[in-house]
Amino acid sequence: MVEWTDAERSAIKTLWGKINVAEIGPQALTRLMIVYPWTQRHFSSFGNISTNAAILGNEKVAEHGRTVMGGLDRAVQNLDDIKNAYTLLSQKHSEIIHVDPDNFRLLAECFSICVGIKLGPKVFNANVQEAWQKFLAVVVNALGRQYH
């Protein structure tokens, strides 16, 4: 189980409250699919994702990005039990979708980049980023739980 300091809890919840999930989710998933094109194979049902422009304009990509942010919200609300909160999601991604668990880490990086760009260094300072990265590492670990 992860130990959170009061400062980390506060940083994560405060940052989460400033994130526009309808904006950051689609941006992060779009970035993932463009920067790491091999991840596109999991989204073949989304229609045309053959070019960067197609990915940027694809509403199914945007919709799934918002869905993923809903999953992150679940983690924020369950900081003390993220692993169990993600059990079914981990099973789905490992047993049904067969997502390479390293893709979760790549998406977490994309989230951090998008949040940092959007909120800037005064909000997303080193202390906040440290707590956020720890949070995302726990989420990534929980999503990969069924792979071990």
From Swiss-Prot:
GO molecular function terms attached to this record: haptoglobin binding; heme binding; metal ion binding; organic acid binding; oxygen binding; oxygen carrier activity; peroxidase activity
Keyword Mitochondrion: no
Tissues with expression: Red blood cells.
Cellular component GO terms held in the UniProt record: blood microparticle; haptoglobin-hemoglobin complex; hemoglobin complex
Pfam families hit by this protein: Globin (PF00042)
Lineage: superkingdom: Eukaryota
Residue span(s) of domain Globin: 3-148
UniProt: heme b binding residues: H64, H93
GO biological process: hydrogen peroxide catabolic process
Record-linked Gene3D superfamilies: Globins
Keywords: Heme, Iron, Metal-binding, Oxygen transport, Transport
The UniProt record lists the keyword Ribosomal protein: no
Protein family per UniProt: Belongs to the globin family.
Record function comment: Involved in oxygen transport from gills to the various peripheral tissues.
Subunit structure: Heterotetramer of two alpha chains and two beta chains.
Protein name per UniProt: Hemoglobin subunit beta
Source organism of this protein record: Pagrus major
Gene that produces this protein: hbb
